[in-house]
Amino acid sequence: MAVQKSKKSRSRRGMRRSHDAVTPENLSVDPVSGETHRRHHITADGFYKGVKVIAV
């Protein structure tokens, strides 16, 4: 099993963890139905960029 040569400081630990934060999802409002959805994803009723792309 690998063992570190020396203890990592709180600063190094924090710098490593700086990329672990969870960011909130970006939401958009569909121009046709006014429904809120995730960016670059179709809405629950099958619209994407105001065009019906899938029959639901």
Swiss-Prot record:
Record bears the keyword Ribonucleoprotein: yes
Ranges of biased composition (kind: Basic residues): 1-16
Any Pfam family hit: Ribosomal_L32p
GO terms under cellular component: large ribosomal subunit
Listed GO biological process terms: translation
GO molecular function: structural constituent of ribosome
Keywords on record: Ribonucleoprotein, Ribosomal protein
Statement: the UniProt record of this protein carries the keyword Lipid metabolism: no
NCBIfam families (UniProt xref): rpmF_bact (TIGR01031)
Annotated family: Belongs to the bacterial ribosomal protein bL32 family.
Name this polypeptide is given: Large ribosomal subunit protein bL32
Species in which this protein is naturally found: Colwellia psychrerythraea (strain 34H / ATCC BAA-681)
